[in-house]
Design a protein with these regions (language model features):
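Extracytoplasmic substrate-binding proteins
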Residues: 3, 12, 82-160, 181-182, ...
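Short, well-structured alpha-helical segments in soluble
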Residues: 3-5, 59-67, 201-207
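A short, structured surface patch at a secondary-structure boundary
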Residues: 17-68, 72-77, 180, 193-194
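Solvent-exposed loop/turn segments at secondary-structure junctions
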Residues: 19-22, 37-40, 72-73, 78-82, ...
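Stable alpha-helical elements in mature extracytoplasmic
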Residues: 19-23, 61, 80, 84, ...
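Alpha-helical, coiled-coil/dimerization segments enriched in small aliphatic residues
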Residues: 39-40, 160-196
């Protein structure tokens, strides 16, 4: 759990996660700094590009962020971003980091961002919209046989399998799919978002069906 101390509603927000850049704009927040990603749909990239760029999620510009005079920075709980917390603290800039391991975590994050930015109503409406969409899809396919899925997650240095203990894996599980990578999950798997990913190698693939 994190405790973020804000003197009031965060009105000058910097996002160092492209997903959060999109979220802020969707909630009606006008961020004073964002990062973009070519992995996002073109229309989303175009919206994000209208706001001041803070370089990239992997290498956010400390100088640009400080110069934007934010009263909140939102990022992801990965070392390349949480390492910036010390610099933010030294400049009296509150920062909040998240990493979601399932669908409910994402919905909670949307509500938290809404609260911190004074957009509670918009956040609640967005969560309801996503819940309605998911429910409709589940109902539409409830009588179909459950498919067996293998979800491959790629990074610049490796490939991993996303189990049902990840956000995308949780979505497939809610839709009724069987994740074949779950055979590699330990009995006492933690709620850490990264523990749901399994290294992909030839040995792993050999026993999966």
């Amino acid at each position: 759990k994190q405790i973020v101390s804000l003197p009031n509603i965060a009105s000058r927000v910097v996002s160092i996660s492209s997903a959060d850049s999109e979220l802020l704009i969707t909630l009606g927040v006008s961020p004073v700094g964002v990062v973009n990603s070519r992995e996002l749909p073109a229309e989303v990239q175009a919206k994000i590009a209208q706001y001041p760029n803070m370089n990239s999620a992997v290498s956010p510009s400390i100088e640009r962020i400080i110069m934007s005079d934010p009263n909140l920075v939102i990022g992801i709980a990965m070392p390349f971003q949480t390492a910036l917390r010390k610099a933010f603290n030294a400049n009296h800039i509150p920062s909040f980091y998240h990493l979601s391991s399932n669908y409910d975590d994402i919905m909670d994050h949307i509500r938290h961002v809404g609260t911190m930015t004074g957009h509670d109503r918009e956040a609640v409406a967005l969560v309801q919209k996503y819940n309605d969409i998911l429910t409709e899809i589940i109902q539409r396919h409830k009588d179909e046989s459950a498919p067996r899925v293998l979800i491959v997650f790629g990074t610049p240095t490796s490939y991993q399998l996303a189990s049902s203990k990840t956000y995308v894996g949780d979505i497939f599980q809610r839709l009724g799919a069987k994740n074949v990578a779950d055979v590699y999950l330990p009995q006492d798997v933690s709620e850490n978002a990264l523990d749901g990913y399994i290294p992909l190698n030839l040995e792993t693939m050999a026993v999966l069906d």
